[in-house]
Amino acid sequence: SISRVNALLIAVFVVVTSSAALADTYQFGQHIEPAYEGWRPNADGTFSFMFGYMNENWTEQPDVAIGDNNFFSPGDADRGQPTHFLPRRNRFTFEVVVPSDWGERELVWTLNVNGIERKAYATLKDDYLVDNMVIASETGSLGAGTSSPESRANIPPVVTIQGDDIRTARVGEEISFVTQVIDDGLPKARRESTTSESDLQRRMMRPPTRITVGKVNGLFLSWNKYRGPGNVTFDPPMPKPWEDTRTSANSPWGALWLPPEAPEDGLYEVTATFDAPGTYILWGRAD
């Protein structure tokens, strides 16, 4: 879990060819806030700026191509940012490496979604320096700001795609790929509950009471579309990597969520099906 601590992100490129609301929530039509999460130094003297976003929609997943509505400045407009945006809060989604002589300059990510423009400003100010414990805290793994020897000893999972990073598929036909995930088992996952069915139903109907962002710790792998023109369907269905706080959500931020059973050999097999031709980037997160 990103108490793990630093969710590992990997990408697979796929070329697909064609063959013969509630009162105070929003489902569609809202904007996206790009978010600067912080920075960390790299061993070679460079620095990594970390970004995420807040999609104000609960349902709409906008696709925003690199260009006037999705760009970085100064310099290259394309810094590896997503063009497909999952619902709600997505933290520490990608990193941009800047040189050792970056100094006091700003790197700005601009997004214009549903007619509203927002910017995130990245700098090397001391207040934005983060480490694994900060990431764990910000993503809810530590609850209300507590830590333990176990959480401090936790290291990120190691994720490896088996086979080629670039695959070719046909529209409507499944392709399969295997991901190896090696993890230290920390923090320990919550055991399955023996709660009665009636008590479980009451808990599902109870409004959330968390005073800060909180998640259920437990290893999971989630594949999602990062870039691409059409929809991608994954099988088995993936846990959500975004903060779906609804009680019954298939998300670590859902109050009753339980981690899926991890394969003994650490090998996760997933199939993906594409509904439109084009070039895709798939985003894998082990957490």
What does each of the following model-derived ranges do?
Residues Y36-G38, D164-A169:
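Short beta-strand segments of immunoglobulin-like
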Residues N6-T17:
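Bacterial N-terminal signal peptides
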Residues N55-N57, R167-R170, I175, V181-K188, ...:
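Extracellular acidic, Ser/Thr/Pro-rich low-complexity tracts
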Residues Y128-D165, P187:
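Proline-centered linker/hinge motifs at extracellular inter-domain junctions
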Residues A77, P82, L200-Y268:
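Low-complexity "stalk/linker" and mucin-like segments enriched in Ser/Thr/Pro/Ala/Gly
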Residues P41, A262, Y268-A276:
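Residue-level recognition of secondary-structure-to-loop junctions
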Residues E104-E106, E174, D265, P277-T279:
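Extracellular Ig-like/FN3 beta-sandwich strand-entry sites
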